Amino acid sequence: MSNLLQAIMNIKSIQERNLGSYKGVQDSKNRMNQMGVTLEVFLKDAFCNTFDIENKDLVYSEYFSYLGNQNNPPDMILKGGDAVEVKKITGIKTSIQLNSSYPKSKLFVSDSRITEACKNCEDWEVKDIIYAIGTIPNRVLKLMFFVYGDCYAASPSIYQRIVEEVKGGLHSTGLEFSETNELGRINRVDPLGITDLRVRGMWIIKHPIKVFKNIIPPESIKNNNFNLIALMKAEKYKQFPKKDRKRIEAEDNIEVTDVKIKDPDNPAKLLDSVLVRYDEI
């Protein structure tokens, strides 16, 4: 069974991070989508340590219980472990596009947006979720930021309340409204009754570099070198196998630091957390 600490060590061990020439990815006419797909493959290889393996699918099936895509989140679920949602951006000043899914503190099997295959991939009710955010200017991976959802996002009820308020506003217009997995659909908006209006949320969240700038000064990110950052609650860090914790704590150029972050549900409360950081020299 793999985990984030093992993935970090595997990423540190390789030197080539030019995703434009990454092996095992089919070419796409859409360059932006291509980099997103390539980052997903890169991270699968990081969790499975399959950077130099030709037949990756056999190993993937050993390590992952579910593999999704941009239309079927999450992007991957580690067997007996965490869910991973991959996001690609071109600069740290760019916000993260979450599209129609609000930020997740955890992944719940009851989530209407996940597929039946995802729900049935294991016997599970709730999973920790990692947002894996890669900054890829000019097709080269420069910053890899892993942040657990419960450090980054509020409880589902916070966002669901906003969704219900928006839906309530649409209902109150007196227009013909249909419930959907999005915010809704307004039917027959023109005199012929032939046009419908889909109403969907487009959720955007700030880059964690901005959110956690008190513990990760943006100026400390070295633009010319590769940087890797991971943030999790202290209790989560302690759940990793002892051998993985010892290995990463003893590794050159990796710093493991105790930090405090604001509770996403109550900023007056501080959470004991752990920051793992690798700055390539």
Curated annotation (Swiss-Prot):
Q: Which organism is it from?
A: Methanothermobacter thermautotrophicus
The lineage, from the top, is: Archaea, Methanobacteriati, Methanobacteriota, Methanomada group, Methanobacteria
The enzyme's main class, written as a single word, is: hydrolase
Q: Which InterPro entries match?
A: Restrct_endonuc_II_NgoPII
Pfam families in UniProt = RE_NgoPII
Name the record gives this protein:
Type II restriction enzyme MthTI
Supply the EC number(s): 3.1.21.4
Catalytic activity, as annotated = Endonucleolytic cleavage of DNA to give specific double-stranded fragments with terminal 5'-phosphates
Q: Determine if RNA-binding is one of this entry's keywords.
A: no
One molecular function GO term is: type II site-specific deoxyribonuclease activity
Sorted UniProt keywords? Endonuclease, Hydrolase, Nuclease, Plasmid, Restriction system
Q: Write out the similarity annotation.
A: Belongs to the NgoPII type II restriction endonuclease family.
Q: Which GO BP annotation is one of this protein's?
A: DNA restriction-modification system
UniProt KW 4Fe-4S keyword? no
